[in-house]
Curated annotation (Swiss-Prot):
GO terms for cellular component: cytoplasm; nucleus. The gene is SH3BGRL2. This is SH3 domain-binding glutamic acid-rich-like protein 2. It is found in: Nucleus. Disulfide bonds: none annotated. It comes from the Eukaryota. A motif (SH3-binding) lies at residues 61-67. It holds the Pfam family SH3BGR. Keywords: Nucleus, SH3-binding. One of its GO terms (molecular function) is SH3 domain binding. Belongs to the SH3BGR family.
Length: 107
């Protein structure tokens, strides 16, 4: 399974862009393989994201906003959930990945 981060490359909202960048930078820094899925370039991907975000995570009005994070077809969460997992040091669990153990250097 690959981590998929649904983003909007042409979002006019600075807050959304910053959240997307935060997720992508974290994954890159931790060498977690992921795929960016730009919902502004594919109506099919946008509809897939809207359909697969659980009802309890959908806003009362409108559609879910990026970034939305999936592990394959399994929904992981939105930015707020990602941020909470980052703060509590549980990102690997949030993403449905096995935690990596830091390797000790041999003396």
């Amino acid at each position: 399974m690959v981590i998929r981060v649904f983003i909007a490359s042409s979002s006019g909202f600075v807050a959304i862009k910053k959240k997307q960048q935060d997720v992508v930078r974290f994954l890159e820094a931790n060498k977690i393989e992921f795929e960016e899925v730009d919902i502004t370039m594919s109506e099919e991907q946008r509809q897939w994201m809207y359909k697969n975000v659980p009802l309890e995570k959908k806003p009362t009005q409108g559609n879910p906003l990026p970034p939305q994070i999936f592990n394959g077809d399994r929904y992981c969460g939105d930015y707020d959930s990602f941020f909470e997992s980052k703060e509590s040091n549980t990102v690997f669990s949030f993403l449905g990945l096995k935690p990596r153990l830091a390797s000790k250097a041999e003396p």
